Structure formats: C-alpha cells, structure tokens
Amino acid sequence: LLLLITIYSSIAAGCLQAQQNDEPWITFTPEQSVSNGLHVVLISGDEEYRSEEALPMLAKILTTHHGFKTTVLFSTDPETGEINPDNQNHIVGMENLQSADLAIIFLRFRELPDSEMRYFDEFLKAGKPLIGLRTSTHAFAYQKNPESPYAKYSWNNNEPGWQGGFGRQILGETWVDHHGDHGTEGTRGLVDGIMERMNHPVIRGVSDIWGPTDVYGTRVLEGDPEVLLWGQSTAGMTPDAPVNWEKSIMPVAWTKSYQVEGGSEGQVFATTMGSSVDFESEDLRRLIVNATYWLLGKGSEIDGTESVEIVGDYEPTMFGFGDYVKGKYPSDYK
C-alpha cells in the first residue's frame, strides 16, 4: 500500500509540474463588459528586486480595475519552466510583444538570444510606448555574444550614438551608482511642483510615495526628459523615517521621447523605484497606472481617484540577491 501511495504521489507531482510547465507565461483577460481592447505586456527578469512578484500584481490591477488584457513574462529555467531570475539568458514568450500596445519592463543585465531579443527590437522600432522600472536602466549586458546586432543595448556601450546602451538612449539613463545607502536608506518621493501645477496626468492623485529601496544616482538625463518625481534619501527603511538632509535629491521618475534608427518615435516613462516591496505604496502603484493611461493617449481619463487596490493576496519578498522564492512557476502568480 505504501508503495502504491508513493507511486501515485510521484505521478500526481509529475502531472502538476507538467501542467505548470505547459503555461510558460500568464495572461489576465478582462471581463468583456470592462475591456478596453488594449494589451499590456509586462516583462520580468532581475536578480534582486523581485520583479517576478511585482509585475503579476500590477498586471492584475490593470486587468481587473482598468480593463487591459495583460501578459506577464518571466526569466525561467528552459528545462523545467521554473522561474529563475538568475537566468539572464532566457525569457520565454517575447513574441507577445507583437500584439502589445504597451510594455512594462523590469529587467537587469539580461543577454537574451537573438531569437528572443528581435521582438523587443521590433517593438522599439515601431515606436510603441514603454515603461521601465528600477534596474531597467541597466536592462542588458552583452558578454557572451558581443557580435549580436542587439549588443548596442548593453548598459556600458560606448559606441557613438549608443553610449550607455538601451538605458541611456531609450530610458534616459544607464547604471551610475547608489546615491542612497543601499540596504539602510529608503526613498521619499517628492512630486515636482512645476509639473504638478501644470496638472501633468501621470502625477494626478500622487502625493505620498515611500519605498525601502535607495535612491539611484543619475547624471543629466539624455534627450528631452520631463522629471515628475524626485527622490530624497531617508535615514532609515521605514515609512516614518526622516529624510537625510545631507543627501541631495535625484530624479526618480520622468518621461521622454525615443527613436531608434529606422524606427518611429515613441514615448517612455521611467522610474528608478519599483521593487516588489516598494509597490506596497499605493501612490507608486498609481504612478504606474497613470503612466500606462498617459502613454496610450488616455491621459484625459485620469482624475487621480481610479482604483489601484491590490487584487488578491500580495506578500512581497524583501529585495536581495539569491532570495527569490524557489520552486515557483508562472501559474503560481495567477
């Protein structure tokens, strides 16, 4: 009997894994009565800040409260289908970008095969709107295949016209440094007063943003940026921590245009905030939802009171290398 139970358990476990592996990404479809007909693709892939937790949560908000169809992609183990943020060379489902009206990316030092990366390149050439979160300033790092036609996107590229790679040329900045003390200081978001007086749609209803991740350093942003939010370091990692007056402020959220050679002009929204625990801040979630509307030409619909309530349970894992929850498959984040 014990042998039969063991065999049955093994078969059941194998069937469950096969079922999970059959779903390499997750899609949320809105009710027909609330669907706006638009598709947002969210791409996770970072080793530290738990994008694999944050993006499904944002996708559920966009679908449930705002009528977007959403698809979430993950860095996975190609053999098992298990989520593995440390695998920098594989994100299944990039072809979903072909039907995307907007993409939200949360990437760090990825080097995807050309067969996957070509969909992202086509997306940019089409001039489609893009949101980049936290480490997406240094989304790509080409080391194994420097001859790839997409190696120009590498964060440390020095080629004329592509200095700073994707981060600087498309989002406005690449990786510079930690302006705040990583792991001991948080970020207090300060809304830009001029943009607020101009009633910029992205910051409508946004006033109270704090997150435990530290402020990233930046230089003068590339292109034609409009800074919407500045970051002030806090002397501690709790929402009531006082600001560190010895630290200057840095831009932490902005918009800008972009255009790759041979492509159409597009718009981006970038923020250097965005870990899974940062998104416990209601107004940070609102910032992303507002940016989604604005980039899709729906800024007039934003009044700052739209729901950004989390759908279902959300217990984000604290950021840290190697600390992602093991044994998870995309379907576990439905």
Predicted regions, residues:
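Extracellular ligand-binding/catalytic regions of CAZymes and related secreted enzymes
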Residues: Q20-S35, E53-A54, I61-H65, A235-K334
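Stable alpha-helical elements in mature extracytoplasmic
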Residues: N36, A54, L58, N96, ...
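Bacterial N-terminal signal peptides
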Residues: L1-A13
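Residue-level preference for short coil/turn positions at secondary-structure junctions
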Residues: S35-N36, Q98-S99, A126, M198, ...
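An acidic, glycine-rich "communication" segment
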Residues: N36, L133-P239, G304-K334
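Sec/Tat signal peptide C-region and signal peptidase I cleavage site
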Residues: C15-Q17
